[in-house]
Regions:
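Structured loops at beta-to-helix junctions and adjacent beta-edge loops in soluble globular domains
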Residues: 24, 38-39, 93, 113-115, ...
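Short N-terminal helix-initiation segments at or just after the protein's N-terminus
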Residues: 33, 72-82, 117-123, 142-153
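Short gly/pro-enriched beta-turn/loop segments at secondary-structure junctions
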Residues: 28-32, 83-87, 102-108, 113, ...
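ATP/nucleoside-binding phosphotransfer catalytic cores, i.e., glycine-rich phosphate-binding loops
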Residues: 94-104, 121-213
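Catalytic core of DAGKc-family lipid kinases
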Residues: 1-106
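Glycine-rich phosphate/pyrophosphate-binding beta-alpha loops
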Residues: 38, 42, 109-124, 184, ...
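Short, flexible coil/turn micro-motifs enriched in small/turn-prone residues
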Residues: 33-35, 109, 150, 182
Length: 213
């Protein structure tokens, strides 16, 4: 398909190749595609952004920074407006086909992406697995959160970021999440089918993108 497009309008310039996520298991049965997915506190942060920041006409990385600071402060204080863990079971198939599973547990923050770097230079994935999807899970009640989380954002976990303390990062080629609730996929909010139907995240691509200057 993309070769066909190139014959009529070849891409030139700063070309980047990226995988995208293919997501199934939504309540409406639709297949979706995106590069960033999150649930748990991501949902509370999204609602705060829509209600308090975007409604005032603020946008761009400045608004994202405001939302991040307010959300992290709410999580540190365990403010119930932001501190609402979502119970999720995880199954990750890595690049070699081996599967890692985690039983259902309250997840304070769960994010997945095919991008190594997110907005504001955030790099929340530190798994060593060679796989197209990064997945990071922070459990509800994660210890030393105020000291650990800044290093999580940088992708260079400090000594507080351990599985025992409630922090874990994976690399996967296929991910299954089982939970009843909502998630954010590139800004679109939707509900999972729940029950016995997993939310399945796979990859398509790589696809070429022309970077805007």
């Amino acid at each position: 398909f993309f070769r066909w497009l190139d014959r009529g309008a070849p891409l030139t310039g700063d070309i980047r190749t990226r995988h995208i996520m293919r997501v199934t298991g939504a309540a409406d049965g639709h297949v979706r595609h995106g590069m960033f997915l999150g649930t748990g506190a991501i949902m509370q942060a999204t609602r705060f952004a829509h209600k308090t920041v975007h409604s005032r006409g603020l946008g761009g990385e400045l608004s994202l920074g405001m939302v991040l600071v307010r959300s992290v402060w709410g999580l540190i204080r365990q403010d119930p407006k932001f501190y609402q863990p979502t119970h999720v079971a995880i199954a990750v198939q890595n690049g070699s086909g081996a599967e890692v599973t985690r039983d259902t547990a309250p997840m304070l923050i769960l994010v997945a992406s095919t991008l190594g770097r997110l907005f504001l230079g955030i790099r929340p994935f530190w798994a060593k697995d060679e796989a197209p999807i990064g997945l990071t899970a922070i459990q509800g009640g994660a210890r030393r959160f105020a000291r650990a989380f800044p290093s999580v954002l940088r992708g260079h976990p400090n000594r507080h970021v351990t599985v025992e303390n409630g922090y874990e990062s994976f690399g996967g080629a296929r991910i299954e999440l089982r939970f009843d609730g909502e998630l954010n996929l590139d800004g679109e909010l939707f509900a999972t089918a729940g029950g016995d139907v997993p939310l399945v995240i796979e990859t398509e691509g790589p696809i070429r993108f022309l970077r805007a200057k």
